[in-house]
Amino acid sequence: MSHRNKENMKLIKQIIPIAIIITLMISCASSRIVLSSNADVSKYKYVIFGSESSGDRELDDVTMAVQNQIAETNLKVLSASDISKVLECSDSILTPNIHVTSEKWDGGHTYITVTFYDYNNNQRIAVVKSSGIGMTVSHDQNIALGAIRKELDKLFKDN
């Protein structure tokens, strides 16, 4: 191997760790939960999904992924058509509004906001938010989904 090739290899070995660090720094997530001041989240045991989403219809796959994450918490999914169960449990049912936006260029953001309402009185109980920024739109979405999952787990897994 020539002297020039050895120098090039040495340079490449120095650049790769820097590139990895930059890539990791570019990928980030943020999330938070805001609760209504008088809300007792522990009383809620059920969730009813309906047509409670908003945002770009092209992001329905992300909306469905959020809905699936909610269904994986300790909240039991009820059907609005199961009238007897709904009437019996109405004071412990939440219904979510899921809003997803995604900037359509690489390096943009994906934002997910889930607002949980009391099924009886339509009052806001909790708002769970996340955002993700990565190298591609798909990466942004996966980061935001991971962040929202952590917040949903915090809010409902011990419920």
PLM features: residue spans?
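Solvent-exposed, acidic/flexible segments
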Residues: 55-63, 105-110, 134-145
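Sec-dependent bacterial lipoprotein signal peptides
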Residues: 1-28
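C-terminal/domain-edge helix-coil "capping" segments
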Residues: 29-40, 72, 76, 124-159
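Amphipathic beta-strand/beta-sheet edge segments enriched in Tyr/Trp
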Residues: 100, 104-134
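A structural "domain/chain start" motif
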Residues: 3, 26-75, 158-159
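Hydrophobic beta-strand residues in large extracellular and virion-surface proteins
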Residues: 47-49, 66, 70, 77, ...
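A short, hydrophobic beta-strand-centered structural micro-motif
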Residues: 49, 79-104, 112-113
